[in-house]
Amino acid sequence: MYLAKMTTAQAKEAFEKDPIIVIPVGSTEQHGTQGALGTDFMVPSYLADHVEDVDNVIVAPTVPYGVCPYHLSFEGSINIGYEGLYMVLHGIMDSLMQHGETVL
């Protein structure tokens, strides 16, 4: 199940079953002249597509940012740094844990 497609009531019901939460993460960064900037987050999103219908699994929205300071000389690359990525993931996990989640 995709968290983003649920209503609040559906999420509450799903969270009561103590599901496994999958959080796809990947950078937006260059992959040469032939590769898409979103490759690093499209792959985990694709893999998440294959587990979203597994019983008791919830797929959280993909985090399309990461740490890539070495790619900043290439147009389109987005670096949020180690602290930024930590803060984003910590915020997501803290929010889910407020709803009783334990397996992330």
Report the location of each language-model feature:
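Active-site histidine-anchored catalytic micro-motif
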Residues: 1-6, 69-104
